[in-house]
Regions:
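Conserved acetyl-CoA-binding loop-helix of GNAT-fold acetyltransferases
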Residues: 94, 100-115, 136-141
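Alpha-helical elements of Rossmann-like donor-binding domains used by nucleotide-donor carbohydrate transfer enzymes
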Residues: 22, 48-52, 106, 110, ...
Length: 161
């Protein structure tokens, strides 16, 4: 796996077929991960994830697999989706066993720096589930502000300084 950039504790690598089993474990964790996705999907198969990785690589998507520098354990994936007009949507999923260890805050602040400084985005926005209070807290800590809310989605944004 090729490392694209890094932070104090995290390597941000290209997505890889080597991590399919880790991806599947994460996205099919309904208790800690999947129930907060902003789309309804009960179960992901190995074929689903393989196609997702192959598409991400082929289309050079801005999606990164995060790995703990020290233990080499898979943390999760983070992505800048729909990059157009100097804006992108942030998406992040952290595997259940790596939650509540500060990786989310570190990953988001690092990706914001990469997106604003290296890629030249002026606005990064996101959507999350209103019941995902931990994530909303982290997003606010990283400088995101809420700009809209529906019964099933909270919309947040951050502008480049």
């Amino acid at each position: 796996m090729k490392t694209i950039f890094e932070s104090n504790r995290i390597l941000f690598n290209e997505v890889s077929l080597e991590l399919i089993d880790d991806y599947l474990k994460m996205v099919n964790d309904h208790e800690k991960v999947n129930k907060y996705f902003c789309f309804n999907r009960e179960y992901f198969t190995k074929d689903d994830e393989t196609t997702w990785v192959q598409t991400a690589i082929k289309e050079k998507k801005l999606v990164f697999s995060m790995v703990d520098k020290q233990t080499k354990s898979f943390i999760g994936n983070i992505e800048l989706m729909h990059p157009e007009k100097k804006e992108a949507e942030l998406g992040i999923a952290i595997t259940g066993s790596m939650q509540d260890l500060g990786f989310g805050t570190e990953a988001i602040t690092t990706l914001l720096e990469y997106g604003f400084t290296k890629l030249g985005f002026t606005r990064i926005y996101l959507r999350t589930h209103p019941q995902n209070a931990r994530a909303i807290h982290v997003y606010q800590k990283c400088g995101f502000t809420e700009y809209n809310r529906t019964s099933d989605t909270v919309f947040m944004e951050k502008y480049a300084n």
